[in-house]
Amino acid sequence: MQESINGNLSEERISGAQQPEAWNGAPVNGSPEQQSASGAESNQLRFQSSLSDSERERQKATDLEHRRAAFARHFGCAPGSEKHVESYSSFDEKDTRVQLAEFYRFNDGHLKKWGYF
């Protein structure tokens, strides 16, 4: 499935309909028509890590920073440690799981609005 030089997506869809391929780019019928320069078949699985370690650590640090800011907005003070930031996450209106009452203030606007207490 090759895209044309000018980037026409309709040609890509047409060629994809003519040659069905698996998610890793191998032909579905398993024919060894295409071989790489090393001679290995193209239908072998290719390992691709979704995130590198540095990206994963950067995302975790960004997430903790957002939680720390939400903690400070919610409780009006800075958290004592990272443990508090991780355990006392921000209130999510779309989260349908049971929310523990001790994590939130009773006079909070979210709780009054949604009638949890």
From Swiss-Prot:
The proteolytic cleavage of the internal scaffolding protein B releases the scaffold protein in order to continue virion assembly. It comes from the Viruses. It is found in: Host cytoplasm. Pfam families: Phage_B. Residues 53-65 have a biased composition (Basic and acidic residues). One of its GO terms (biological process) is viral capsid assembly. Residues 31-52 have a biased composition (Polar residues). Its EC number is 3.4.-.-. Phi KhT, a host-range mutant of phi K, can grow on E.coli C and B, besides K12, and is more thermosensitive than the parental phage phi K. Belongs to the microviridae B protein family. Component of the procapsid complex composed of 60 copies of the internally located B, 240 copies of the external scaffolding protein D, 60 copies of each of the viral structural proteins F and G proteins, and 12 copies of H. This is Internal scaffolding protein B. It comes from Enterobacteria phage phiK.
